[in-house]
């Protein structure tokens, strides 16, 4: 196992390397290879002007090398020259159970509660088709993860958006009265909860989840709880699994997880659900079996096993320290040096969500013009409109600290 991280004064001495600037060009990386390439995938940043390198801050993956136990595990399996049919191993399930016990103090999780999903959105799609019909409304919070919007559109369902609201301290909060009203008025029986929330970065407290789940219980709503960001926690915040809130929450929730956000494995595809209720589990299995979609890749299985080893815990702890440093720097700089930009300090994820309405109106700019200014100097940030904020910009800060400071130097000198 890797050595322990030590802290000397305010300088972090880390076992793992989060400072090397990794060249991902030509290595199957949408975040860099798609820029300026005319790729039809959402709205892609344009190439920067001459003299500026690209700092990828749009696609939600990381610009760090993953924990070494993952490639080691993949290579060990790949060296055996047969890749035929197989079943998930005991080690796969035991790794998941152990990870949730050690990270989130989950007890009572058994192999029968775990099911493979070919991506978190694949799970969401299966659940939507299993428990709703085309034309039905589904409750979500806005700002909203763009992937949810696409799944609902592609399956013929309708998003009923309950806006998150900022309190007097600028913290995003659920509006419980609004949620309850929308559910009742639209006869909604399925809700999607993003915990931690993307793009706003909220790590919901137990009390907040208790209030939300009480509303879902009152209205007999099944809940899809997307907890893919649950390992990415900033500044000491703690994730509360939705299913841990109560026995009722445990039985009405389809929770979905993956090592992909935590360990930068999105290209390998491999998520899993946790379902305790037999009725929900059977309906999900039936819908999934109809498409033959959820077939696990053997290398994805071994990637998860490698990720969820002991070294993975330390790697994630160090990652969260580095991401906290990045987030704190960016948040403080915006608050102190850039007028007219609203930003809430994320508690989880590595995304920063900017609201730029005041700035744009004060400077007679459209949001598209502001975004293009960033792209022109290599700050490849992302439009916020697909997340239901027409004045929004989403920034991925999972890059080395030196690139975070470089990005904001460019923003200060050339953009804002």
Regions found by a protein language model. Give the residues of each.
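PLP-dependent aminotransferase class I/II
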Residues: 252-336, 342-346
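N-terminal small-domain helix-loop-helix segment of the aminotransferase-like
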Residues: 15-119, 126, 310
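Short, Lys/Arg-enriched N-terminal segments with co-localized hydrophobic residues
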Residues: 3-13
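Conserved core of the PLP fold type I
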Residues: 79, 83-214, 231-232, 237-244, ...
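Conserved PLP-binding catalytic core of the aspartate aminotransferase-like
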Residues: 323-324, 328, 337-376, 393
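PLP-dependent enzyme catalytic core of the Aspartate aminotransferase-like
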Residues: 362-416
């Amino acid at each position: 196992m890797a050595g322990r991280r030590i802290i000397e004064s305010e300088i972090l001495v880390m076992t793992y390397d989060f400072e090397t600037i990794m060249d991902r060009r030509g290595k199957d990386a949408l975040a860099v290879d798609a820029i300026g390439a005319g790729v039809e995938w959402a709205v892609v940043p344009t190439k920067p002007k001459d003299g500026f390198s690209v700092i990828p801050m749009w696609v939600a993956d990381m610009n760090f090398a993953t924990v070494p136990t993952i490639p080691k595990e993949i290579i060990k399996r790949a060296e055996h020259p047969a890749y035929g049919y197989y079943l998930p191993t005991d080690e796969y399930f035991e790794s998941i159970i152990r990870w949730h016990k050690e990270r989130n103090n989950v007890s009572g999780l058994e192999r029968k509660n775990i099911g493979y999903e070919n991506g978190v959105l694949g799970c969401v799609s299966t659940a939507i088709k299993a428990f709703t019909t085309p034309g039905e409304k589904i409750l979500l919070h806005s700002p909203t993860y763009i992937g949810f919007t696409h799944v609902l559109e592609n399956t013929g369902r309708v998003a009923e958006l309950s806006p998150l609201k900022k309190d007097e301290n600028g913290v995003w909060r659920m509006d419980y009265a609004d949620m309850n009203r929308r559910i009742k008025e639209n006869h909604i029986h399925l809700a999607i909860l993003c915990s931690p929330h993307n793009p706003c970065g909220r790590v919901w407290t137990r009390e907040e989840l208790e209030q939300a789940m009480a509303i879902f219980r009152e209205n007999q709503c099944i809940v899809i709880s997307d907890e893919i960001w649950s390992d990415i926690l900033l500044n000491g915040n703690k994730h509360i699994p939705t299913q841990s809130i109560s026995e009722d929450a445990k039985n009405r929730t389809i929770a979905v997880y993956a090592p992909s956000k935590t360990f930068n494995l999105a290209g390998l595809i491999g998520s899993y659900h946790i379902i305790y209720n037999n009725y929900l589990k059977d309906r999900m299995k039936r819908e999934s079996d109809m498409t033959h979609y959820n077939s696990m890749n053997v290398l994805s299985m071994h990637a998860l096993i490698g990720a969820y080893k002991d070294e993975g815990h330390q790697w994630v702890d160090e990652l969260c320290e580095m991401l906290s440093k990045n987030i704190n720097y960016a948040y403080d700089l915006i608050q102190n040096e850039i007028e007219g930009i609203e930003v809430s300090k994320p508690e989880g994820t590595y995304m920063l969500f900017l609201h730029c309405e005041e700035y744009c109106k004060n400077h007679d700019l459209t949001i598209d013009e502001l975004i293009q200014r960033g792209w022109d100097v290599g700050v490849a940030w992302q439009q916020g409109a697909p997340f239901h904020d027409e004045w929004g910009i989403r920034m991925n800060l999972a890059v080395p600290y030196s690139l975070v400071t470089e990005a904001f130097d460019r923003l200060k000198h050339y953009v804002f």
